Regions:
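NAD(P)H-binding glycine-rich loop region in Rossmannoid oxidoreductase-like domains
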Residues: 50-100, 124-126
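Catalytic helix-loop patch of NAD(P)-dependent Rossmann-fold dehydrogenases
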Residues: 128-173, 194-198
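Substrate-positioning beta->alpha
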Residues: 149, 153, 179-184, 198-220, ...
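Conserved C-terminal active-site "lid" loop/helix of NAD(P)H-dependent oxidoreductases
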Residues: 209, 245, 269-313
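Amphipathic terminal alpha-helices
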Residues: 301-309, 313-335
Length: 335
């Protein structure tokens, strides 16, 4: 069985590759020539640099692959941007690259048995902030960030094609060894400070990256899961305060100054951070799109369909996952 995992050099992609190898797949990693392959050192991994920008070249590349190797049995399309200095790039990379890829797979007769799109809870936008009920799959999708909007467009491209079966996963906050966004808060608390945006506690949910990889393969390998979509989370709900204090405990910090700052101040900080990032030509964790995520109070989602259809049971609690992550950060010199 052959599998292609795009975005394989990224945080989530690396764990998807590890899971594929563990399950005995002939594993193809879709990576750019200039990508960091330091986490893709297993000699069994095969590489392909997909030519997303050129529709004809991509089609010919996939046609040539199919003729020589045969189509992949499964494809996990995980490639994408989570932050950028140019918002237009969200739509180009997350949405239009997906459109060209889908078209090329069909035109090149390289259709997989199943195609999995790694999307995001952000494709739904604001959750109910009065009763804080979970976001459900049948709720209207109204993303409020450019990132979320671009992921929704990609989802729609996948849903509209009829060449092969698909499944769409929408993970909530993904954390684990090597993740950089949550690491910002971990590093801040390690330094003795914690800044939380907004005076109303934020309800947040998580999924450990290894559990997400397991869920992805359960969705691919279950023949009954056809043309469906799921939220992926560990099923627990936390407040931002609980998350910060758990980090403090696990880091062994006796004294941390926890400060809640008004949303207007957080917005200013994100805007300034984005401006400085643009001046340096580097994408930054704190940006205007990120502020809209920080502003949202309800990140609770209904993961029951995932458990019912796939029998998915996360192996990691937030505590266990953070313990493993912090150990990795320390072992690799991040902390």
């Amino acid at each position: 069985m052959k599998i292609l995992i795009t975005g394989a050099s990224g945080f989530i992609g690396g764990f998807l590759v590890e899971e594929a190898l563990r399950r005995g797949y002939e594993t193809w990693a879709g990576v750019r020539a200039k990508s960091d392959k330091s986490r893709l050192q297993d000699p069994k991994i095969k590489f392909i640099d997909l030519r997303y920008k050129d529709q004809e070249a991509l089609t010919e590349q996939l046609r040539d692959f199919a003729q020589k190797q045969g189509p992949w049995d499964f494809i996990i399309h995980n490639a994408g941007l989570t932050k950028t200095t140019d918002r237009k790039q969200f739509y180009e990379v997350n949405a239009e690259n997906t459109r060209r890829f889908l078209h090329a797979l069909e035109a090149a007769q390289c259709a997989p048995k199943k195609f999995l799109l790694m999307s995001s809870l952000s494709s739904y936008g604001m959750g109910d902030e009065k009763e804080f009920r979970p976001i459900r799959l049948n709720d209207p999708q109204r993303p409020n960030t450019d990132y979320g909007k671009s992921k929704l467009i990609a989802e729609n491209y996948v849903r509209k094609q009829t060449a092969f079966p698909y499944v769409i996963l929408r993970p909530t906050g993904v954390y684990g060894p090597g993740e950089k966004d949550y690491f910002v808060e971990i590093k801040s608390i390690q330094s003795g400070f914690d800044f939380t945006a907004g005076y109303t506690p934020q309800k947040i949910t998580f999924i450990y990256v290894k559990d997400l990889a397991t869920a992805a393969f359960l969705a691919l390998e279950n023949e009954k899961v056809i043309n469906k979509h799921y939220f992926v989370g560990d099923g627990d709900v936390y407040t931002d305060e609980q998350f910060a204090h758990l980090l403090q405990e696990l880091l062994g910090k006796k004294r941390v100054l926890h400060l809640r700052v008004p949303l207007c101040l957080a917005q200013t900080a994100c805007a300034c951070s984005e401006w400085f990032g643009k001046m340096r030509g580097k994408s930054v964790t704190l940006n205007n799109d990120k502020f809209l995520i920080l502003k949202q109070r309800n990140w609770i989602c209904d993961v029951q369909p995932l458990h019912e259809d796939l029998g998915f049971k996360p192996k990691y609690t937030l505590r266990k996952g953070l313990e493993e992550s912090i150990q990795w950060y320390r072992s690799n010199g991040w902390l």
